[in-house]
């Protein structure tokens, strides 16, 4: 057991949904402007997950007004209000950096089909 494990365990969130690269997420982020605080939603495709434990991060990419925007979030950050999984993507890679060079429909990710139970 490592020395920092008990300290790290106290900082871990338990409300993080299961998501993978290729999934489309809505990340609700707490933004503080002066004395006011509000929630801002950042929706995009997960192109990478990195690290582990308390230091785990994920990168989300979206196209806003024709410009690609990427943002890296720590999974267990207190500034994240909550995370919603919008759609599940069907991809074969862990890092989807190739999406940066694709435009329009070519950058679209196939949606994973849920198999019916029963």
Swiss-Prot record:
One of its GO terms (cellular component) is cytosolic large ribosomal subunit. The keyword Membrane does not apply. One of its GO terms (biological process) is translation. Keywords: Ribonucleoprotein, Ribosomal protein. GO terms for molecular function: structural constituent of ribosome. It comes from the Bacteria. SUPFAM superfamilies: Translation proteins SH3-like domain. Belongs to the bacterial ribosomal protein bL19 family. This protein is located at the 30S-50S ribosomal subunit interface and may play a role in the structure and function of the aminoacyl-tRNA binding site. This is Large ribosomal subunit protein bL19. The lineage of its organism: Bacteria, Bacillati, Actinomycetota, Actinomycetes, Micrococcales. The gene is rplS.
